[in-house]
Amino acid sequence: MEMKHLLKIIMVMALTGFMSGCSELEEIEERGFVVGAAYDIVKEKKANPIMKGTYQMVLPSKLSQQGGQGGGDSENYINVSAKADSVFEQIRIIAKKISRTLFFPHIQVIIFSEELLSHPYILQNTLDVYIRDHEMRRNIRLFVSNKNAEAILKQSAKPENLPAQYIDMLAEHPPKNAQMIEAARIGEVQEKMISNRSFVLPILELTKQGVQMNGAALFRGKDNKCVGNLSGEETVGMNYIIGKKIGGFFTIRKKNQLITYEIHKLRRKIKVSTTNATKPKFDIHLSLEGTLAELHFSDHKKVLNEKRLEKDISEEMEKRIQKSIKLVQKKYKVDVLELGEVYKRHNYKEWKKVSKNWDQGENYFSNAEITVHVHPTIEHSGSALPKRVK
């Protein structure tokens, strides 16, 4: 894990400084190793709004005392904040408050409040300082908080004892949960902003137990404004379309029946027709391989078999995916489904004619015909199906 690697580096540096002399140790102690940042809106302005930037710093002395592990009577980090309309100004203000210099090369996570990112260009402007710094890593993970972003960096994170580390670890779970999207890296987001492509970022929510990743924030390509979000359930449909989710569970609940289908493999094939360049047709075929994780039914007289169960799974999954499509295509009108890229590869000549009005201007994306066909296969059912069901 990147964060664990960072903690080891800081601890080794601190111990090395102690062994080699006071001057090097003092230099390390004077640095505030920033591992996470959070940005919230404070005051509306015509141009850039006033933001509150919160920076989580690791304390090398605490790490060396604890042997690099979480625990102890005190936290091994501090959060420092400042209010300004730019990151540089916030850093300047913080420099007057504390004795440490903020050191950013090892930052792992940046969290924005959804309210802040509802303003055009704020994401791009705020990330600019991170992108321009040649010492900054390109794999910083980006998140959106559905409420206060600072609160995410304050939540209890034991046994990790570093909220930023805990958030970084959460991002490892998406392959097992289709209600979460894959972690977004700053380098990937920069590429999409440069090419004016719409994109998504994972949403963080505070719960009684701590923090969870659930759902997706939708960003418009032309001005990287957050135009809305998808719930965890709605995110499932999007994940299957873009073909980046190969795991997770899909549950169907009917009157007297519950089916939980565990997906192990997903293959996607998209057929495109650009006969009408401004109203293309996309036929999306999803071939799934999985097993029955759970099956409940009370009508024992009703004879079910694998084909019938596969049909039920197919119909319900198509229904939910079409619901997700309707939201992003008709309500938010942003191509986070990446169908523009499919169009581009299929017919580059026609794509050049419509690209500037794909999901902006005339917004041809919102009028495209998108149909989904789900082909599930139940593997190794064995004793999972009662005799009457097989």
From Swiss-Prot:
GO biological process terms on file: spore germination
The UniProt record lists the keyword rRNA-binding: no
Lipidation sites (S-diacylglycerol cysteine): C22
Family listed: Belongs to the GerABKC lipoprotein family.
Membrane topology: Lipid-anchor
InterPro entries for the chain: Spore_GerAC-like (IPR008844), Spore_GerAC-like_C (IPR046953), Spore_GerAC_C_sf (IPR038501)
Compartments in which it is found: Membrane
Assigned GO CC terms: membrane
PANTHER family membership: SPORE GERMINATION PROTEIN B3
UniProt keyword Lyase present: no
Organism superkingdom: Bacteria
Organism of derivation: Bacillus cereus
Protein name: Spore germination protein GerLC
Signal sequence extent: 1-21
Lipid attachment points (N-palmitoyl cysteine): C22
